[in-house]
Amino acid sequence: MATTYEEFSAKLDRLDEEFNRKMQEQNAKFFADKPDESTLSPEMKEHYEKFERMIREHTEKFNKKMHEHSEHFKQKFAELLEQQKAAQYPSK
């Protein structure tokens, strides 16, 4: 059975969403393990804030890159479908 562009695109979108959700869940678990701020020294509080910001930024960048790759794969898949169509039905 041949895969349509819509099926391929939907599957990539679903995988992107699932991966993003899992990353957010992992981050939430990590952030939940943070000690109570009232017990932290100012230096450690600053350290945790920087680390959390870094994790959020890297997660955002990674998800953006994953989305870009998915869009690239969708484009390539569409091109392959066009090539296949042109090979099956060459114009006279």
From Swiss-Prot:
Keywords: Calcium, Cell projection, Cilium, Cytoplasm, Cytoskeleton, Flagellum, Microtubule. Its main location: cytoplasm. InterPro entries: KMP11. GO terms for cellular component: cytoplasm; microtubule; microtubule cytoskeleton; motile cilium. It is found in: Cytoplasm, Cytoskeleton; Cell projection, Cilium, Flagellum. GO terms for biological process: cytoskeleton organization; defense response; positive regulation of cell population proliferation. Belongs to the KMP-11 family. Monomer. Binds calcium. May be involved in the regulation of the cytoskeleton through interaction with the subpellicular microtubules. May be involved in parasite mobility and attachment to the surface of the host cell. Behaves as a strong immunogen during infection. This is Kinetoplastid membrane protein 11C. It comes from Leishmania infantum. The lineage of its organism: Eukaryota, Discoba, Euglenozoa, Kinetoplastea, Metakinetoplastina.
